[in-house]
Amino acid sequence: MYLLPASNGNGFATLAGLHGLPSPFYCEHGYPGFLTWHRAYLDAFQDALCCINSDVVLPYWDWSSGPTTGVPPACRQPTYVHRNGNTVPNPLYSGPALGGGQTNRAADIDTRTFGDLATFAQTAMGNSNFSGFQSSLNGPHGSVHGRVGGHMSGVANAGYDPIFYLHHANVDRLWAKWQQSHPAPLPSSERTKELDPFYKTFSTDLMTGADVETTDQLGYRYSTFCWFLPPFVLTDLLVVKLDPDWFRIRRTTAKLIMNSSKMSSRTMDLRVFVNDSRADSGTKTLGNPAFGGSFGVFGMEVGEEMSDKAMRVGSGGQKFDLEIDISDCLEHIDADGDELSLNLVPVGPDGKVVPIKHIPADSFELLLK
């Protein structure tokens, strides 16, 4: 997004300008429109992210749940080490400022505290009507802007600091959470308020508060906890050992995701067994508590070896992900001293194990939420 020109509607500079300068200050910070306008704004930002990479989801910075100091660690360093081993600029550290250069924050931001804002946020959550909730939440929202400092401290330039979007995602999350216990419709003045410059899909009509009343209308929900194990590749043993401490957390679902960008040369049933390193092609699946599920891979089966390049061409250059839910299999690892292993057994149509080289996976990920 940073590299796209200002003339591109999905460019960072274009979207950042909608909040303040150089656009005519579209943002709403009064009533009606504060929460609804910013929800529409975040939706536009998320759509722009997806146009570049559909796997990206805008995260939120939860400054509202307890004592915190400084901005999130992911936003503190100017560089980070990419998974490929290269040190690259951190896009969450700063953004391109209006007029040139990079955005900045308060010099002592790493020692500034935000814990008291959690109390104010909880007070806001206790309001029984929308107007009171919106008014109460606006205060700590503004305090975060001020304490981050630098470009974030003024409406005109706040949108140019990437942390703006993490901050407002949390404001939006708090509203969504409040709505769960207060499902009444928005006041009429909020529902009919036009959210300039955001338009309804395939329409010349501006969106209104009624179009963003719930996150479901926009196709997303907030999770209390969401955690990714960094992508890993298969070894010759087909067994992945994971630190059990990572799983001693409260969770609702656990999904294993296979990322791929190429066709498979072989058709296979890639079976996943949890904490059963001895599982093989003959291990039963039905009624087996260690069986997490399987990835059904439909391969070329052309009777000859295919090069990696040919398999990628065969996929049409598209990426695809397959996932299975292994939540039930992870219930037993809460016990102290337990370890977790994932044994991936590729079984061909003939019932025999398929060599690991034929598995068309770029990487695997484990998602807990």
Regions found by a protein language model. Give the residues of each.
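C-terminal accessory segments of proteins
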Residues: 1-369
